[in-house]
Structure formats: structure tokens, C-alpha cells
Amino acid sequence: MKLSELMTGVTPEADYEGWVTNDDYVLAINLTPNMANTKIGDYGVVQMGIGGLDAQLNPIMVDKTYIRAGQSSQKTGSQRSFALSGDRYMGDEAQDYILSHAIKYGTGNGVVTDYVYFNILNGKGEKGKVSIIVNSDGSGNAGESSALDVEFKKIGANPVEYTYAADTP
């Protein structure tokens, strides 16, 4: 499903106030990162068959001990990551891209893509680049659904603030 399809009829409210569930977050990826000017509305939504989406900031810390002051910790950065778990669904554009031969066995820039991650209630989130790491493209016991385990990890510059707007390049 394309992001533009998901957002049809949805209008985020910038001043939304209330409880938020994990289902209120949208993760969409560029399925054609080698093509210039892919519209964000054409990104593939990562949702079909996904039971778990664990968004982490993974702080990077430096710990030092100083005379008469003891230990001090300083945050020097964050490593954004997304852990995806769920069941394989063939025919879903996002899953088919993530689990393609080129991504599973690719390295370097060959597994890098753009992403947006935002809250559907207020449209606010972030935009950046991630490396796709496929840990498992199908596992489970006889008679069970074929499970997948994938990580997206930030690469390059920190993500930038993003607010959803239809048809943005």
C-alpha cells in the first residue's frame, strides 16, 4: 500500500491531544531509492503482516570518571532503529522490497533507503535514511505462519523533523 492510499480521507490534526497507540504510527519507505524525486506519497507503508514495530532511539553515551566528582555520562548521539516482526505476506510491495534478493544479500548503499515515520493523529514525525538488515526472511514451525525479523538502522545524518503533507517530494 502506498502512503497516499493510506492517508486518503485522513486529515492529521496538528493540535491533537489524547492517548496514542502503536497503530497510530506510520512507517513508510522509498521502494525506488535509486530513482530521483520519488514522492513521499509513493513510499510503501510497512504494515501488512507486521505485528511488531519497535522504534528505538538507542542513545550513544560516553562515561568518564572524574576526581572527586565520580562518574559522569554524556550523551553524544542517537542511533535510530526500527525492529520489525510479523508474518510474511507475498504481494505486499513493502515486504516484497524488504525481502528481495537484492536487499537480503546486498551491502552498503544497496540496502539504504529513505523513510518517513510519523503519528497519523497529528502528522508529526521524522524523515531520514536507513540501512535495511534482514535477520530472518521466514521462520517458524510446521503449520505456522512464516515469520520475518527485520531491522532498519539510521545511516548518515540524523533524521529531520517531518510533518505529513500530501504529495511532497
Regions found by a protein language model. Name each.
Residues 2-85, 129-145:
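Solvent-exposed edge beta-strands and adjacent loop segments
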Residues 14, 23, 41, 64, ...:
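Intrinsically disordered, low-complexity segments enriched in small/polar residues
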Residues 81-85, 117, 149-153:
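Beta-strand secondary-structure signal
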